[in-house]
Amino acid sequence: PVRVRHIPLQIRSTFRPDLPGTLIRTRHDGASGIAGFAGRRRMAMLRIHGAPPGAPAEALRALGEEPFCLSETLGQTTVLLDMGSGAETATLAARLRAQLPGAEVTLRENLAVLAAICRTSDAIPPVLQAVESAGVPVHHLLRCAPGLLMIVNDSQYETALRSASVSK
């Protein structure tokens, strides 16, 4: 009945009723360029500098690893992985260093992926600006029109999501 009659729902937290919550509408009013958000927590990121193109992906395959995301740009490879235990990701970083001699492999743990699905690419800059204005550092950014993936600290995921969701 709510969908049929186009009745908006206001969802609020039982624990924080003073907060505005989330308004869910059945129709798009055109005011927001954001279609929605998705996220994934407890991620780790490996950055690899100085390896030949394609070598990090080949090394990961040889080690039997399936990354969540792998991107290569200007001599840098960024690999996102489910964190698992800290020991597992640290061991993987050490194994990659052995597989890729001469390459610099750095590991960052306790990250989250926040994806903004945008209706147009014009909505991307305000989302990024809102997240950064909230004091959330974006460690890696992948633009994939119309949307983007932002890698943020896991502890700041909720702040990033709240900031992005109110961006204009």
Question: Where is each model-derived feature located?
Answer:
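C-terminal catalytic "cap/lid" subdomain
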Residues: P1-K168
